[in-house]
Amino acid sequence: FRFVPFSDEVRAEILRLAGGGPASAADFCRMNFLLGELFCEAGETLCAQTGTKLSDIDLIGSHGQTFWHIPLPETYLGHSFRSTFQLGEGSVLAQRFGCPVVSDFRVRDVAADGLGAPLVPYSEFLIYRSETECVALQNIGGIGNITCLLPACRLEDVFAFDTGPGNMVMDAVYTELTGGEKTFDEGGAYAAGGKVHEKLLEMLMQDAYLSRKPPKTTGREYYGPDFVKKIMDYARRENISGQDLMATVTDYTAQTIRYSVEHYFPRKPDKLIIGGGGSMNKTLVQAVAKALPECRVLTNEDLGYDSNAKEAVAFAVLANETIFAGCNNVPTVTGAKNPVVMGKISL
């Protein structure tokens, strides 16, 4: 596994487009193919660093970059429907690598009246299921999502949902505090020097999304710039220091996880395994452990896995199922009417 980050310039443009700011159809057209090219470069870097020939690759699974996600029906031009929008042209990858590429997974679940998320629980069931323990899996990417695997569960017993913001709010606040010089609080070091502002935390925990019952999903369209602006405005009015503000929004993510477990799990998990970029934030991991004292809180690294690889592994598994025409959504998780084969194939 290798992690290849976007350049600051590309990241800023993705955030601009995904934030709903002024943009033309041409911007999205270009971005679709730019992402395809960047994914190719990342794949070539991986092959070069691992000594893998391009001709040895049999299949590529590519989720792409989400730009907008509307999981609940909205009325548009007289019609009511759900929708989701990811970019990163799979045909560009297919041309460069000369192998089948499976991409654009979420739309098929949404077409079946599902939420289109989370999709990782399919692979989590295969990898982490236990005969004797209730295992909770908390992914902390931009958005947090949690999966519950009851002891000896079947696939149809699995349930999962988005817990709320993962790193998204923390990163946006830290970017504001540093004037854009830094985009995330590495290791949670800055937050570790602050104290939680209880009044602000209480206000954040009144967030209506938290009390919505699963299945549910959310994204930048909810926890994006407008949400963060309210936090920053409040912090300025109340003269909350930067470190206290970071400590508060970090604990907020931890408390959304606690709330989700306490309100929506059928039983207390024996252990909770944290994955995604948030697992690298020691302050956040400690906050989760403090919030769930009766649960063993681990990271994927504690089990010998790479947290950053979790979603890459998940979409490789999903792509393999697609090629063999295997249903790869989990209707009990997404709320879809029926099992479907997700992913579009570029040959």
Model regions and ranges:
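Glycine-rich phosphate-binding loops at beta-strand->alpha-helix junctions
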Residues: 269-289
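Short beta-strand-loop/turn "lid" adjacent to the catalytic site in phosphate-handling enzymes
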Residues: 22-87
